[in-house]
Swiss-Prot record:
Coiled coil residues, start to end: none
Family matches, as SUPFAM superfamilies: ClpS-like, Ribosomal protein L7/12, oligomerisation (N-terminal) domain
Family named by the database record: Belongs to the bacterial ribosomal protein bL12 family.
Protein's organism: Agrobacterium fabrum (strain C58 / ATCC 33970)
Disulfide cross-links: none
GO cellular component: cytosolic large ribosomal subunit
A single GO BP: translation
Protein name, as recorded: Large ribosomal subunit protein bL12
Name of the coding gene: rplL
Subunit structure: Homodimer. Part of the 50S ribosomal subunit; present in 6 copies per ribosome. Forms part of the ribosomal stalk which helps the ribosome interact with GTP-bound translation factors. Forms a heptameric L10(L12)2(L12)2(L12)2 complex, where L10 forms an elongated spine to which 3 L12 dimers bind in a sequential fashion.
């Protein structure tokens, strides 16, 4: 029984690539196909990637278009970023550009609402 526990422990330390290679070797040795388990493992890998994306904590607020009310958007950009008038105007006229980068989800939503209320089209990435 101790040998089985050691095998389980050794298998637990394998990387995904090593486990896939082990699977291929066992298929060749035993003359079987493990198509269904491989598909389940691939689906598990995709789920892990989706979980990582859901846990994103930093967002960029991107000004896509200033819209018709450019002056209000420039004022709001100045208030948000602390830029001078010329720098804020250049940022607004150079859209699409990031207004703020690496902000929390709540702050990104707040900034998006403020800019949209001023008349801008905003994207959060």
């Amino acid at each position: 029984m101790a040998d089985l526990a050691k095998i389980v422990e050794d298998l637990s330390t394998l990387t995904v690539l090593e486990a896939a290679e082990l699977s291929k070797l066992l298929e060749e040795k035993w003359g079987v196909s493990a198509a269904a388990p491989v598909a389940v493992a691939a689906a598990g890998g995709a789920g892990a990637a989706a979980a990582v994306e859901e846990e994103k904590t930093e967002f960029d607020v991107v000004l896509v278009d200033a819209g018709a009310n450019k002056i209000n958007v420039i004022k709001e950009v100045r208030a948000i970023t602390g830029l001078g008038l010329k720098e804020a105007k250049d940022l607004v006229e150079g859209a699409p550009k990031a207004v703020k980068e690496a902000v929390s989800k709540a702050e990104a939503a707040d900034l998006k609402k403020k800019l949209e209320d001023a008349g801008a089209k905003v994207d959060v990435k």
